Amino acid sequence: MIGGLFIYNHKGEVLISRVYRDDIGRNAVDAFRVNVIHARQQVRSPVTNIARTSFFHVKRSNIWLAAVTKQNVNAAMVFEFLYKMCDVMTAYFGKISEENIKNNFVLIYELLDEILDFGYPQNSETGALKTFITQQGIKGQHQTKEEQSQITSQVTGQIGWRREGIKYRRNELFLDVLESVNLLMSPQGQVLSAHVSGRVVMKSYLSGMPECKFGMNDKIVIDKQGKGGTTDDAGKSGKQSIAIDDCTFHQCVRLSKFDSERSISFIPPDGEYELMRYRTTKDIILPFRVIPLVREVGRTKLEVKVVIKSNFKPSLLAQKIEVRIPTPLNTSGVQVICMKGKAKYKASENAIVWKIKRMAGMKESQISAEIELLPTNDKKKWARPPISMNFEVPFAPSGLKVRYLKVFESKLNYSDHDVIKWVRYIGRSGIYETRC
């Protein structure tokens, strides 16, 4: 398990130090500073082994968090703890900075006492921690026996992520399906690689201890070995099934229900949380197709034409569209003509940046450019970097659909019909590139 936890600033000075095992000495602090923070070359690996000691580290702004151990531990568990620790600190005092850590060092030590027990991660749910650790410290002497028993039951009980007695004047539930679509396409329009990374993020403002049930597409296939393809016309009609390569859930989800019924049943935490994270490579709806045409006119001129086609329902609007067309290093001037939006040549970035505010589905637009080149003695041909694209669309490129979202609360006097529910789909570009 974790032998010690250290938090450093950008200079390598220790801001927080907590040692849980006798085999971790003061030399471990100096070893990390010298070999990682002050290393001549940037250390890319998140795990560094120094003298039979393993350092697992993450960086937030200019702050380093390092977990140290001499045992053979589960690396995924250690990183999960480090990221959870970052989330907890952010929830308590906002941005993780040197000033905030110094101003809240007593609070951080109190949090570590609860989150880590002899190096073993325990309760890291922010909602549960905030019931008995406040930014003013623990006020145990002012709490009644009833309040203290509620805290004990929450921390040690089955539902550690939600406290009892929550009340709202209006019960609301917000669900966001957030997806990032990644694509690499050949100049001929052949998909070389494509995948979607998705998250289901919820905000729950519900009274009592409700039971929520969330259903997706009629058929969900979990396929960890299958190789996925893509489809260009899937966006024109709703898909009844979706193949998910892998997925992870918040601890509140009852996995047995998902395995048998493919429905997600859970008692939600209060406030905002990530319910589910998934990845898919099959039957992806590609929101845009980029068709490039590059023609060399002698050695001092290039003619570029790029057509973008939207591939989704005409009733939907894509926003924040940006196409980046790379130019050679010896470019001397560019003349641009575009049908829609605004285009500008940025010499510092060696690219033509074409921006369109909005674009409806099943439409197309194009840009033409004449690129003047300076004579050069370099015999190497221009490598032609891929054309990249950014956008935001109001649907899920994976085809994921929310079929129902139900809330049950047996003890309080409200039903599913009394809950105001909001469902939103947002698809964004990840690395969306087309070779030219």
Swiss-Prot record:
Task: Decide whether keyword Transmembrane helix is in the record.
Answer: no
Per the record, the major location class is membrane
What residues bind a 1,2-diacyl-sn-glycero-3-phospho-(1D-myo-inositol-3,4,5-trisphosphate), as annotated? K342, K346, K355
Stored InterPro entries:
Adaptor_comp_med_subunit, AP2_Mu_C_sf, AP2_Mu_N, AP_mu_sigma_su, Clathrin_mu, Clathrin_mu_CS, Longin-like_dom_sf, MHD
* Membrane topology term: Peripheral membrane protein
Query: Gene3D superfamilies, per this entry?
Result: 3.30.450.60, Mu homology domain, subdomain B (2.60.40.1170)
- Subunit record text: Adaptor protein complex 2 (AP-2) is a heterotetramer composed of two large adaptins (alpha-type subunit and beta-type subunit), a medium adaptin (mu-type subunit) and a small adaptin (sigma-type subunit).
The protein's name is AP-2 complex subunit mu-A
Q: Which organism is it from?
A: Danio rerio
Q: Which gene carries the instructions for this protein?
A: ap2m1a
